[in-house]
């Protein structure tokens, strides 16, 4: 059932869920219930699979997912569920930025650009640098923004092919590469807790461009969490295996 109660009045939603439940009990049916409505999924489903950009990031019994969500995206989804209790307030630590283009997803963990708990191996790249700079520009004066934006240039410059795996290059639109490097160093110093910087092995100017070397990216795998009935695809729970290491292992088999 794909979004069977989406955009319906609450009374109609309840009737449809009640009918589906009756049919399940009377006929022994099994449903694949696709929805963005986690509240109804909690009521209706025995097991839940949370997906992001078409990939399952966490799956397990419904009670286990709701009582102790593991994946940062699952946590964010559950915080966003409306709560009628005014003492709980509104969730303000929801994922930053926009959902990426599914046809060109981020490398490594596709959720990492928006994740508050991202780690060095999550798959950092130059597009993430652009997002961090855009966040910076919400905090500075209009004059400083205009000056820095002239140096950085258009967003498309951050989408250039990597000169080599795990290495990004950015040429300044105006000014010098040293100016661009100074801007990046200033941002790293002003916000050292930003997850991106934990994934940067080094950055330097060669006079023409700034080159940034990122820590080897690893694609998380959906694996069981020890001591639970849940499987999660997240480096916070399983040791990252960089793509280069996986490729080397495959060649030796």
Q: Predicted segments — roles?
A:
Residues 61-233, 237-251:
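Charged, flexible cofactor/metal-binding loops and thiol motifs
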């Amino acid at each position: 059932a794909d979004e069977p109660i989406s955009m319906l009045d609450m009374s109609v939603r309840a009737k449809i869920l009640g009918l589906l439940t009756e049919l399940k009990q009377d006929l022994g049916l099994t449903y694949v219930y696709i929805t963005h409505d986690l509240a109804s999924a909690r009521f209706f489903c025995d097991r839940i699979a949370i997906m992001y950009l078409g990939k399952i990031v966490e799956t397990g019994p419904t009670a286990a997912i709701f009582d102790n969500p593991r994946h940062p995206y699952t946590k964010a989804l559950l915080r966003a569920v409306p709560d009628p209790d005014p003492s709980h307030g509104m969730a303000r630590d929801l994922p930053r930025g926009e959902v990426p283009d599914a046809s060109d997803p981020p490398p490594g963990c596709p959720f990492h650009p928006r994740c508050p708990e991202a780690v060095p191996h999550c798959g950092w790249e130059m597009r993430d640098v652009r997002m961090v700079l855009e966040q910076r520009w919400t905090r500075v004066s209009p004059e400083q923004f205009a000056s820095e934006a002239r140096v950085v240039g258009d967003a498309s410059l951050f989408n250039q092919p990597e000169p080599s795996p795990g290495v990004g290059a950015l040429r300044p639109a105006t000014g010098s590469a040293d100016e661009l490097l100074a801007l990046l160093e200033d941002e790293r110093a002003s916000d050292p807790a930003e997850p991106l910087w934990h994934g940067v092995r080094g950055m330097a100017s060669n006079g023409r461009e700034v080159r940034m070397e990122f820590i080897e990216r690893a694609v998380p795998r959906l694996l069981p969490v020890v001591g639970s009935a849940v499987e999660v695809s997240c480096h916070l729970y399983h040791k990252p295996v960089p793509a280069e290491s996986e490729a080397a292992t495959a060649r030796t088999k």
